[in-house]
Structures are given as structure tokens and as C-alpha cells.
Regions:
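Bacterial Sec-dependent N-terminal signal peptides
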Residues: 1-26, 31
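Preference for extracellular/luminal or secreted protein segments
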Residues: 25-59, 63-75, 288, 309-614
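Second-shell residues forming the walls of enzyme active-site clefts
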Residues: 48, 84, 92-109, 119-121, ...
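Short acidic, glycine-rich surface-loop motifs adjacent to enzyme active sites
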Residues: 54, 73-91, 175, 250-273, ...
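Active-site mouth loops of central-metabolism enzymes
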Residues: 56-67, 133-146, 228-242, 304-312
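Short glycine-enriched loops at secondary-structure junctions
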Residues: 61-65, 113-122, 162-172, 212-218, ...
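Catalytic domains of carbohydrate-active enzymes, especially glycoside hydrolases
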Residues: 71-87, 150-164
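Active-site-adjacent structural elements in enzyme catalytic domains
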Residues: 91-110, 140-158, 356, 361, ...
Length: 614
């Protein structure tokens, strides 16, 4: 064998070996299972009973009462608290608190986040949002789902989170669901399973543990478990074909955690015990029948679906959840009393030490997998230098815009045969660039909204995002060879039919009117923010005026506006987020082709389906 070829083979093998080692670094367990297991065993031998029990708890701290918070967190740290969940707080103080707590902790804390569309879900004035899951369910290109999961996972890891309680793999086949809805990938169980797995794999490849929720399935309910107890009245065959299918698939694909919902499912537990407290649902089904060996956590135990509906004392609820097979007890109401309850239960033999050690070992192995064990205090510190600028990544902003471009739905686009004005015969009403229009008007339907963005010192209300639509449309028009006259009217706050009618009267001479409805709501109980009188008024005017509608809200709008084909065009833009406003303008003008599909059935349109080959 020639020497040069031999050297090439040696170098190639060396390179492949290095690549394999580097690729294995994010998953320490897979790379060095014996060493990690020995490390975990060594830690467990030094832990007291109270410290082992405290490892089961993940709690929530807020900054409203700093002295009391500090006293409580210090007491819990001394007891060996397992982890924290950060939500509804300010980013920098949150991360500084984690650094302070880890400086005191014998075992590093598992830092977790409930961030289905990224950290912005909890730090909503400081970090750009990604599209919500139902919007991702409108994208046909599966690679984009993985990319979204990877970007969110990387964002979480860079901010110091080891676990993100996402994705939501509930199958939303109930349009009246008040709490899942836009958090689901859609109504097709196979699509929810595949997209959930792609999102999960992206997150975990980026170094953040994912969590499939809310087992055994919260999609086909019309009750919010934050407020009461939803009931799934279905038989086992239906549950296995719909609700359980995504969980089974994500378990097969290696999801790190599964979260239990607070639900009543008598087909799985004939006693009607709440799912988060049910041995048959957790141990018999999730562990034994579905074969899940990862970490099982509850949904927040402070939610009324279990805190009130169980009828148990608050400190007893975590004990019952643990006895049923749970590993992580999330956000109980009485943490210290709950720890004591489980300690006493172990001492009196109600819970075996083996059962306790099983959960503690799983939690410590998860911490090892995410690089928490065997690191010094300084290595564990989250770098907060320039954090507010670091969370606004140009590559994430570009990805978010791409996701929006691919997800908006052209629900209706009529054919219009106007020779002399169109560049094509029998042309669709949109895009605008194919028409020789003289005057186009944008009529913005804007409500009152809360602040949703505070980036680089500028405060934005969510309703002000209409500016992104209008400005993008204006830029595209101004950059064309034959721009049309573009004017705008904004209807703000409490809008009457008279105000709307007057605005339309003033636009009688315009070739085309684009109506942007920016004040949509997510609540089915509030009719998704739809004013039926106003929509019918717009539809009547569309008989004599060329009116296209951009609905910045849910696809379920088609259930409420069955006459949407009375308009020249009807675009579903999912939400009034800034990125959706920009994408809508690109589609209206013709810079981007509309390619989003229906993730759910609504009106006369069925959810998009294909063979996902699961």
C-alpha cells in the first residue's frame, strides 16, 4: 500500500473519530454511560432521604416579593431542591437568581421553561417569538419544523435552560377547545405525531430536553384544566388511534420527558381518578404499555383541574402523583409541606426506597445528559453579559420570517376577468403586482392591545404590528416599475358599523381595498374576536367594491364566516405577530407565493392530509 494512501486512511479515520466524539458531546450519557452511571450512584450515596425527595420538585419563583422569595428559595436549596421553572418574569433577574441558587446548591438545579414558541412565551417583552404550533402545522416543508425546534432548543440552551416543556402533541380536533387550540399542530394525529417528533428532535439535537404533553391527550375537550377537570369520554380504540398516537411515536423517537395532563379518562382508569394521580394511566399505560423509560412530570399541580377537583389537601397531591408513577412534581402549592409528606411516606413504608431511588436516578441522569453534573460552580454560571442583545439573533429572525412566508393560507382567491387592468386574462384577484391598478387602499381594523414586544428600548403594542403590513406593502410597491397609489385608513378601538361604512364610502374610487383585521382573538368563547355584523357589512360591500380580507387570526374563522368567498380574496395569517404582517404583505403584493395549508378543518375546507408513513 503506498505511503501517501496509508497516511490518507489514517487521517480519514482520525477525522471521523473526532467528528464522532464531538457529535456525542451534547449527550453525555450516550457517550459515557458507565462513567455517568457511576457518577450518579456516587451522588446518590451521599444524599439524605430529604435531599432525594426534594430532587423530585420543580418550583416557580417570581420577583414580586423578593425577601420572601429569597427566604423560601434558600430553605428549599438547603433541602436539595431538584429544579425551577421560570415564567412570567424578567429575563435578567431570572437568570441572576438561578446563578445565585446554583451557587448554594449541592446538586445543580434543573432549569426548565414552558416555552412552546420559544422563550418569548414567558419573557414576552424581551425576546422575539416564533410562530405557534398550529401555524407550523400549516407548513408543508417538514425540514422547517425541525429547524424551528432546533432554533428554539439552541435559544433555550444559550439562556441556561436544560428542559423546555414542548412540544404540545395534543390533537386539536375540537374547535371549541379553550386552552390547546393554536398550541397544537392540528387535527390529524399522524401529522401531530410527525411534526411533534421533528420539533422534539430539533430541540434535543440543539442540547435542550423536550417534553411531550399533555398525556393522554387534551385536544378534544372544551374545558380548560387550569380552571376545571376536562373529561375524555372515548373508548380505548379511539384513544389509541387519535390521542395516544403522537405520544407513542415521540416515545419511539426518544423524547426525554412526558408531561401528564389533568384529565379524567375512564377508558384508561375506570375509577375516574385524575390522570396526573392515576396509577393505571401513568404506570400501566405510559410506562408499561407504551414503554416510556424517560422522565415523567406533571402539569402544574397548582392548576384547578387537580388542585381543586381532586378534593385532596394541597400537600397530599404531590404524594399521590408520585405514588402513581410520576418523577417530577411541577409547581405544587405547598412545597415544603409536600416534601415532608413524601419523606414521612417513605419512612412509614407507604413508598419504598427503591421507588424513590428510581425517580431520583432518572432525574440525575437527565441532569448528567444536559451537562450539569461534574462541573464547577463557575462553569454552571449562566453568562448574562449582553443577554438582551444576544437573544435577538439575526439567523432566528430570518428563520421566523421564512416560517411565516410558508405558513399563511390563501383560503380563497377568486378569478377576475378585467381586460385592460390585468397583465393576464382570467387572473386571480391577488397578487396585486399582476394588476395595473391606479389606486389601492389598505383599511386596517385595529383594536386595543397589550404590550407584546420591547426590543432595544422600543415598546410595541401587539395591535401596532399593522405597521409591518403597511410598511412592507409600501416598500414592495415603491420598488416596482409601475407603482400604484397606496393610501390607508385605520379604524381603532371600539369600531361601529357606521364607522366602517363611512370608511368604505370614502374608498369608492379605489381599484382594490385590502382589509386587514388585526384585532382577532384566540378565544372561541369570544367568537375569536369576530364581529359578525361588520363581516357581513364587508361582504355586502364586496359585491360592488373589490375587497380582499387578511384575517390575522385562527383558521377556525371559516366556521364563523361561511360567506368568506363573497370577498375577492381571503387570507388566513394565524396571528397579528409582526412576522405574519410582513408575510401577509409579501403574499398580497406577490413577492411570496402562498403555500400554507389548513391544519384543521373549518367551514367548507378540510384539514390538509398526506401519507406520513409513520
Amino acid at each position: 500500500m503506498p505511503l501517501r494512501f496509508l497516511l490518507f486512511v489514517v487521517l480519514l479515520l482520525s477525522t471521523l473519530s473526532t467528528m464522532k466524539a464531538n457529535a456525542a458531546q451534547p449527550n453525555e450519557i450516550a457517550a459515557q454511560p458507565n462513567e455517568i452511571a457511576a457518577k450518579v450512584d456516587s451522588i446518590m450515596r451521599r444524599m439524605s432521604l430529604q435531599e432525594r425527595v426534594a430532587q423530585l420538585f420543580v418550583v416557580h419563583f417570581v420577583s414580586k416579593h423578593p425577601r420572601r422569595v429569597k427566604e423560601l428559595q434558600n430553605r428549599l436549596i438547603k433541602r436539595g431542591l431538584g429544579g425551577v421553572i421560570l415564567m412570567d418574569d424578567k429575563l435578567l433577574p431570572s437568570l441572576e437568581r438561578i446563578n445565585a441558587m446554583n451557587a448554594l446548591a449541592k446538586i445543580p438545579l434543573l432549569v426548565t421553561l414552558d416555552g412552546e414558541w420559544g422563550a418569548q412565551m414567558r419573557y414576552w417583552t424581551e425576546i422575539p417569538a416564533f410562530p405557534k404550533q398550529m401555524q407550523l402545522g400549516s407548513i408543508k416543508d417538514r425540514k422547517m419544523i425541525y429547524r424551528a425546534g432546533y432554533a428554539i432548543g439552541k435559544e433555550c440552551k444559550d439562556l441556561g435552560f436544560q428542559v423546555n416543556y414542548a412540544p404540545d402533541v395534543d390533537v386539536n380536533n375540537n374547535p371549541d377547545n379553550p386552552v390547546i387550540h393554536y398550541r397544537s399542530f392540528g387535527e390529524d394525529p399522524q401529522k401531530v405525531a410527525l411534526y411533534g417528533a421533528l420539533f422534539m428532535q430539533g430541540m434535543q439535537d440543539a442540547g435542550t430536553s423536550a417534553c411531550a404533553k399533555h398525556f393522554p391527550g387534551h385536544g378534544d375537550t372544551d374545558v380548560d384544566s387550569h380552571k376545571s377537570l376536562p373529561v375524555l369520554p372515548f373508548d380505548i380504540k379511539r384513544l389509541e388511534e387519535v390521542e395516544l398516537l403522537p405520544f407513542k411515536y415521540l416515545i419511539e423517537k426518544g423524547v426525554d420527558l412526558v408531561m401528564l395532563g389533568h384529565l379524567q379518562v375512564k377508558a384508561m382508569d375506570s375509577t375516574g381518578t385524575i390522570s396526573s394521580l392515576s396509577y393505571p394511566i401513568i404506570t400501566d399505560w405510559l410506562k408499561n404499555k407504551l414503554g416510556f423509560e424517560g422522565v415523567i412530570c406533571t402539569d402544574a399541580l397548582e392548576m384547578k383541574g387537580v388542585a381543586v377537583e381532586s378534593g385532596l389537601p394541597q400537600s397530599r397531591i404531590p404524594l399521590e402523583a408520585f405514588k402513581a408513577g410520576v418523577d417530577i412534581l411541577l409547581m405544587p402549592n405547598e412545597v415544603e409541606a409536600s416534601i415532608k409528606q413524601i419523606v414521612h411516606a417513605v419512612r412509614r413504608g407507604e413508598i419504598s426506597k427503591e421507588r424513590l431511588n428510581e425517580s431520583v436516578r432518572k432525574i440525575l441522569m437527565l441532569k448528567a445528559k444536559r451537562g450539569l453534573l461534574g462541573r464547577g460552580k463557575e462553569e454552571l454560571r449562566i453568562d448574562t453579559t449582553g443577554i438582551n442583545k444576544r437573544v435577538i439573533r439575526p439567523e432566528n429572525l430570518a428563520l421566523i420570517d421564512s416560517l411565516a412566508n410558508q405558513s399563511l393560507i390563501m383560503a380563497w382567491n377568486s378569478r377576475r376577468n378585467q381586460l385592460g387592468k390585468s397583465t393576464m386574462i382570467n387572473q386571480r384577484a391577488l397578487p396585486l403586482k399582476h394588476w395595473r391598478y391606479g389606486k389601492v387602499a389598505y383599511l386596517g381594523y385595529v383594536g386595543e392591545g397589550r404590550i407584546v414586544q420591547k426590543l432595544e428600548g422600543s415598546v410595541k403594542s401587539n395591535v401596532e404590528n399593522f405597521e409591518h403590513f403597511y410598511n412592507t406593502l409600501k416598500e414592495l410597491n415603491n420598488g416596482s416599475q409601475s407603482p400604484f397609489q397606496l393610501d390607508s385608513i385605520l379604524l381603532r378601538g371600539t369600531i361601529t358599523a357606521e364607522m366602517l361604512s363611512s370608511a368604505l364610502d370614502s374608498l369608492q374610487g379605489y381599484d382594490c381595498i385590502i382589509v386587514g383585521i388585526h384585532n382577532a382573538l384566540n378565544s372561541p368563547a369570544k367568537n375569536f374576536g369576530i364581529n359578525d355584523e361588520h363581516m357581513r357589512l364587508l361582504a355586502r360591500r364586496a359585491r360592488t367594491q373589490n375587497i380582499s380580507v387578511v384575517w390575522f387570526g385562527t383558521p377556525y374563522v371559516l366556521n364563523k364566516v361561511p360567506f368568506y368567498k363573497d370577498f375577492a380574496s381571503f387570507i388566513i395569517a394565524h396571528s397579528n405577530a409582526d412576522f405574519n404582517n410582513r408575510a401577509a404583505a409579501r403574499i398580497v403584493y406577490g413577492e411570496v407565493e402562498p403555500c400554507g395549508v389548513m391544519p384543521v378543518s373549518a367551514g367548507d375546507q378540510k384539514a390538509y392530509k398526506e401519507d406520513y408513513n409513520l
